[in-house]
UniProtKB/Swiss-Prot annotation:
Pathway: Slime biogenesis; slime polysaccharide biosynthesis. It comes from Escherichia coli (strain K12). The lineage of its organism: Bacteria, Pseudomonadati, Pseudomonadota, Gammaproteobacteria, Enterobacterales. Keywords: Lipopolysaccharide biosynthesis, Transferase. It is an enzyme of class 2 (transferase). This is Colanic acid biosynthesis protein WcaK.
Length: 426
């Protein structure tokens, strides 16, 4: 069985890395003989962080070349591509409409040829199909249809759907893939509300729950050992932060208000006698355009006792982060996957909602009270919630352990079911 896993943006986002690692770990357990290739927009850093070979994404390279085309002709082509390219691809796939006879860029033709060497294509999960990210997100899927290969989308959150062209492509792609397996039910409700077809929808989990703890073969690096030692010295709460853009406008807030409010939460945690470690699931490795460490450093100016506020500047992979989060008492995460990684390594987590996916994931876990709307951060009420949670850790840990093991079991069944279907097609 030869599989291609595509759709990873970069493992520089350790959430995307955990999603990919969990899927790979599950496939390795369920079908150790499967031949699996992985593709990412940023293959060099992703390969290092995952500790396995990773191929570059040719469609991303093509898009970068097109976008950097010089001169008036280059700019005109860019505008035309942005407006019509996905309609042309869709016409090619459906073999209908006037646009079907227009030549597509060589990169698409080459990519279709590459896909034909696989038994099936898996579009790895995450929050990939979001209207704000635009229609290029559907290119891989349309090429898979052209290559006439099975396409399974595993562990996704989808939507919102507030753009007509995006919705048209979503309807076609989600209706023609072999399965769109959602990781939470809020996305399903959004699809129904926006009249997006749900015929191929199945309910699953986020594949980051499937990351193996690698208890037998994990060796802590110098940096990881340092942070494990720091966490062992005093009771520790971990936090993760982010630059809110592009969601700040939709949320009606500012980065400054968010940072000030989060500093208030950190100060309350320090008052409760804990130290705080700020970990970052997104760093600027390999030119990735988000670096949460800068937000963590910026927060320091508002912290009452900076000596007990530690910012991790090291480049850690998601598994190493899991080990450090596992040594903490609680995680308060703006990044959803810091919460998932934390809980997978047996540390309870509060996830701050700035998108529907966090509420959906916590709801599914049976811990809806652990997803806190960002409004509660901004109005200061999260401070008391965190203090209450710290007072209820033993009871919470028992519920968490049961919920995570249930989620992992569902996740393994989800991957098994996909592998069985691919085996039948093959």
């Amino acid at each position: 069985m030869k599989l291609l896993i595509l759709g990873n943006h970069t493992c520089g986002n350790r959430g995307d890395s955990a999603i990919l690692r969990g899927l790979l770990d599950a496939i390795n357990i369920l079908n150790p003989h499967a031949e699996v290739d992985v593709m990412s927009r940023y293959p060099v850093s992703s390969s290092w962080l995952l500790n396995r070979p990773v191929m570059g994404d040719p469609l991303f390279l093509q898009m970068k070349q097109h976008n950097s085309a010089a001169g008036v002709v280059g700019r005109v082509k860019k505008v035309l591509r942005r407006r019509y390219q996905h309609q042309v691809l869709l016409s090619r796939v459906t073999d209908t409409g006037k646009l079907r006879n227009i030549a597509i860029a060589q990169g698409f033709t080459d990519f279709v040829r590459l896909l034909s060497g696989y038994d099936a294509i898996i579009q790895v999960g995450g929050s990939f199909f979001v209207d704000l990210y635009g229609v290029p997100q559907f290119e891989h899927a349309l090429c898979t249809f052209m290559a006439k290969k099975p396409l399974f989308m595993i562990g996704h959150s989808v939507g919102p759907f507030q753009d007509e062209q995006f919705n048209q492509l979503a309807n076609y792609v989600f209706g023609h893939c072999d399965a769109l397996i959602l990781r939470e039910s809020v996305s399903f409700d959004l699809m129904k509300r926006s009249n997006i077809t749900t015929a191929k929808v199945e309910h699953g989990v986020d594949t980051a729950w499937l990351v193996d703890h690698h208890t037998e073969d994990f060796t802590a690096s110098y940096a990881v050992q340092h942070w494990l030692d720091v966490a062992a010295q005093q009771k520790t709460v971990a936090i993760t932060l982010r630059e809110l853009a592009p969601f700040d406008k939709r949320l009606g807030t500012t980065q400054q208000a968010y940072e000030k409010a989060f500093a208030g939460v950190v100060n309350r945690i320090l008052d409760e006698g804990y130290q705080v470690i700020a970990l970052s699931t997104c760093t600027g490795i390999d030119s990735y355009n988000k670096d949460d460490r800068m937000v963590a450093l910026n927060l320091r100016q508002h912290i009452s006792d900076p000596a007990r506020y530690h910012v991790v500047m090291d480049e850690l992979n998601d598994l190493e982060m899991g080990k450090i989060l596992g040594a903490c008492e609680l995680t308060v995460g703006t990044r959803l996957h810091s919460a998932i990684i934390s809980m997978n390594f047996a540390t309870p987590a509060i996830a701050i909602n700035y998108e529907h996916k966090s509420a959906g994931i916590m709801q599914q876990l049976g811990l809806p009270e652990m997803a806190i709307d960002i409004r509660h951060l901004l109005d200061g009420s999260l401070q008391a919630m965190v203090a209450d949670t710290l007072g209820q850790l033993p009871a919470l840990n028992a519920r968490l352990s049961e919920a995570v093991s249930r989620e992992r079991q569902t996740g393994m069944q989800m991957v098994q079911s996909v592998l069985e279907r691919i085996g039948e097609v093959k």
